[in-house]
């Protein structure tokens, strides 16, 4: 693993045309859960920041909750943009390694628990500025790609390969950025999509 957070997606060959709208409607319960977990995630991020700055260590329990949150959000995000047909599980496993309950989306982490850079963590918000700017650009391009994919899937019943690869890359970038933001690693996330 070259970065301590990975995203893998097994794309289906065909996507039912109704999923371009149906998946968004079906994901409403997950969106509510993500909203509530987002509140928990904010508290966990603040606690992690305080603990790492004071001790130089990240407790495994805090890291596990962050891993679960990122994994859950990623699985639901892939479903919302109609890249998959199976309904994402309501899975709240806090292990760093994916438990395999969702065979289409795999998100693994290798959180750094010991020997953390207190200085890097202390200034994390400043260090994130370039990543956030690049992430906003990738996000805008991903929204445009999703609009094109909406019509492509509606007409063809499948994702065009180039668009699919681009959206998978943006998801990979998002998982890495989230791991850095959530203090799971001090390794700066690559700004590319590979």
Residue spans for each PLM region:
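Membrane-proximal intrinsically disordered regions of secretory-pathway and membrane-system proteins
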Residues: 1-194
């Amino acid at each position: 693993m070259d970065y301590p957070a990975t995203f893998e997606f097994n794309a289906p060959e065909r996507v039912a045309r109704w999923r371009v709208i149906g998946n968004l409607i079906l994901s409403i319960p997950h969106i509510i859960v993500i909203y509530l977990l987002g509140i928990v995630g904010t508290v966990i991020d603040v606690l992690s920041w305080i603990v790492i700055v004071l001790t130089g260590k990240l407790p495994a329990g805090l890291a596990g909750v962050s891993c679960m949150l990122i994994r859950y959000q990623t699985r639901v995000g892939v479903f919302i943009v109609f890249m998959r047909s199976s309904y994402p599980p309501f899975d709240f496993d806090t292990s760093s390694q994916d438990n395999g309950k969702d065979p289409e989306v795999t998100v693994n982490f290798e959180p750094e628990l010991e020997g953390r850079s207190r200085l890097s963590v202390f200034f994390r918000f400043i260090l994130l500025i370039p990543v956030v700017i690049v992430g906003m650009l990738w996000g805008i391009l991903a929204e445009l790609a999703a609009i094109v994919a909406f019509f492509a899937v509606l007409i063809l019943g499948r994702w065009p390969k180039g668009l699919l690869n681009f959206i998978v890359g943006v998801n990979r970038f998002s998982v890495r950025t989230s791991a850095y933001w959530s203090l799971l690693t001090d390794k700066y996330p690559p700004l590319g999509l590979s």
